């Protein structure tokens, strides 16, 4: 019985971390575009969220969550964020991943680049297209080149632009 509590704790910790990480990004999108119909079925959005959920759930549990527990984190996080059936959204995301959906994979790649840049683990980061674009925009606006501001610009140039293009 103690083992079950351990798994529950990891799922809870992972879900809390996943929701806390993505909520400000979703909030920014809702502020600018409302909550577009179909956002919780959009391949790019789901890929971006799944990768973000995975990253923060693994960080929060020190890598001790995977498999079905991670799937439960996805379902719980989607339920909390969307007020819809998170398990259904997770099944769709799983299908998109299995089908190698190009938009889903782009969302995953963008979220991975942002997460790795934040952790300073992105290989050849100066030449990564999203980082380079964010730095060019920051320089053009004469903004600070602090890492946190580059991360914010990366989110705008990837997730926010994608939402605007699809739903704006």
Q: Which residue ranges define each predicted feature?
A:
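Short N-terminal edge-element motif at the start of the domain
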Residues: 1-37
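N-terminal interaction modules that seed assembly of large macromolecular complexes
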Residues: 24-67
